Amino acid sequence: FVPYVHSYDFTRPELDCAILFGDGHWPGAHAHHITGNEVALIAPRTKVADWPIHTPRDVARYTLLRHVTVPEAWLRWSETHGVEGLIDPLAGPQFDQFQTMIRAVMAGMGLALVPRCLVQDEITAGLVREPLPDADLRGGYRSDVGYWFCYPEGRTQLHALQCFREWLLA
């Protein structure tokens, strides 16, 4: 394994493949989408009366938690739900890990937009809730970014890589 810092150099000989979060465009790499394009709006599981959110407009009353790799998330959300201009999409605490952001929501720090694949277990267990279950996309949105299986262009013929790719994408 090669430790992740901020990007991968797919010309490095020790790098066979990576799972990356982004838009699927990395120089020198083939990328296959895995998951993560469906984004969920999540709120603390407290009583609805304590966090009353009945329409997308109500979201403006709360602290919006943001992830550093998707700074446009709240802007995209507000455009999807027709409330652009009602929220400041750049205000609110930033996190660099989605799991930390989910825990912040669980602690009542605010609302967050998180890839559904990373928060579905917490939603199902009732640890967080989707405050707009009847809205389009259950209050979330479809994103242009997600998780991708990537590998260097020069490694497409590696048998082990082909087997792993087929298993992962099945």
Could you describe each region identified by the protein language model?
Residues 63-84:
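Secondary-structure junction motif
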Residues 1-27:
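Central regulatory/effector-binding core of bacterial HTH transcription factors
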Residues 9-11, 30-33, 55-57, 83-85, ...:
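Short secondary-structure boundary/capping segments
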Residues 133-170:
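A late-sequence structural motif
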Residues 13-20, 39, 106-111, 127:
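Alpha-to-beta junction loops
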Residues 27-65:
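Flexible hinge/capping segments at coil-to-helix
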Residues 5, 20-24, 44-45, 97, ...:
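Beta->alpha turn/N-cap motifs
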Residues 86-130, 135-136:
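Hydrophobic hinge/microswitch elements
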